[in-house]
């Protein structure tokens, strides 16, 4: 049994698998575990007896302050050193200026895509930030980063005197008739329009590539963005392939 961890800025996903094909997963707020013992206290009731079967731990983390917690947790409770996802040449070539700057979650996504779906495609991951990644002939060619939905609505709320904090959901109208509708239209639909523009431009240059959609916020706009593949486990699959796959 393998324990796979995707440490994000807002939430962290913990998943167990035996074969890299079927996954059980749980989502925790990243801020709830500040020590290895706190992490154990949250995970033990969820994993139960499966904790005794863990023989390897793989981690993709974009929150450096949590890495020590994960390391100590792995050593104390499993006597295992975790394997950390990072950009390195192997099944994927990293054709960017500084591969070390590519987030571990994006590395995992790209590895999973190449292993499971092919060597050419566009990956959209919608979380705290929204990322776009391009893979051509098994080579990572770069991408784009946009603010995520909740980052945008909280920024408007904190950065202004009167704008409210609104629910994040799609707008089914052309223009908003009140402040809440204006924000929803700008944040959610505006993000979709931006992604459509980026995807469209990529396809103009690289051809009609398939799009895979993933990430905790992707369900909000799943029906608004044209895509060929929806895989909410893409990042976790990538952690498995990177750390324990062939």
UniProtKB/Swiss-Prot annotation:
Reactions the enzyme catalyzes: (R)-pantothenate + ATP = (R)-4'-phosphopantothenate + ADP + H(+)
Compartments it resides in: Cytoplasm
Gene that encodes it: coaX
Protein name in UniProt: Type III pantothenate kinase
Role: Catalyzes the phosphorylation of pantothenate (Pan), the first step in CoA biosynthesis.
Cofactor binding note from Swiss-Prot or TrEMBL: A monovalent cation. Ammonium or potassium.
Record GO cellular component, one term: cytoplasm
Primary localisation category: cytoplasm
Organism: Thermotoga maritima (strain ATCC 43589 / DSM 3109 / JCM 10099 / NBRC 100826 / MSB8)
Gene Ontology annotations of biological process type: coenzyme A biosynthetic process
Highest rank taxon of the organism: Bacteria
Molecular function (Gene Ontology), one example: ATP binding
Enzyme type, top EC level: transferase
Keyword annotations: ATP-binding, Coenzyme A biosynthesis, Cytoplasm, Kinase, Metal-binding, Nucleotide-binding, Potassium, Transferase
């Amino acid at each position: 049994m393998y324990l796979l961890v995707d440490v994000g800025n807002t939430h962290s996903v913990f998943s167990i698998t035996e074969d890299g094909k079927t996954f059980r997963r749980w989502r925790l707020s990243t801020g709830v575990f500040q020590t290895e013992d706190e992490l154990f206290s949250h995970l033990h009731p969820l994993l139960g007896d499966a904790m005794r079967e863990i023989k390897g731990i793989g981690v993709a983390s974009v929150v450096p302050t949590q890495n020590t917690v994960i390391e100590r947790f792995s050593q104390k409770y499993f006597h295992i050193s975790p394997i950390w996802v990072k950009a390195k040449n192997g099944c994927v070539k990293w054709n960017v200026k500084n591969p070390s700057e590519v987030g571990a979650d994006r590395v995992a996504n790209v590895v999973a895509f190449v292993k499971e779906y092919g060597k050419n495609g566009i990956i959209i991951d919608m979380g705290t930030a929204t990322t776009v990644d391009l893979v051509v002939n098994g080579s990572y060619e770069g991408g784009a980063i946009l603010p995520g939905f909740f980052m945008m609505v909280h920024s408007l709320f904190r950065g202004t005197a009167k704008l409210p904090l609104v629910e994040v959901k799609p707008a089914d109208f052309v223009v908003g008739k009140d402040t809440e509708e204006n924000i929803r239209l700008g944040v959610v639909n505006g993000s979709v329009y931006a992604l459509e523009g980026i995807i469209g431009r990529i396809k103009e240059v690289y051809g009609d590539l398939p799009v895979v959609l993933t990430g905790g916020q992707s369900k909000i706009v799943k029906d608004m963005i044209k895509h060929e593949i929806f895989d909410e486990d893409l990042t976790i699959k990538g952690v498995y392939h990177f750390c324990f796959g062939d």
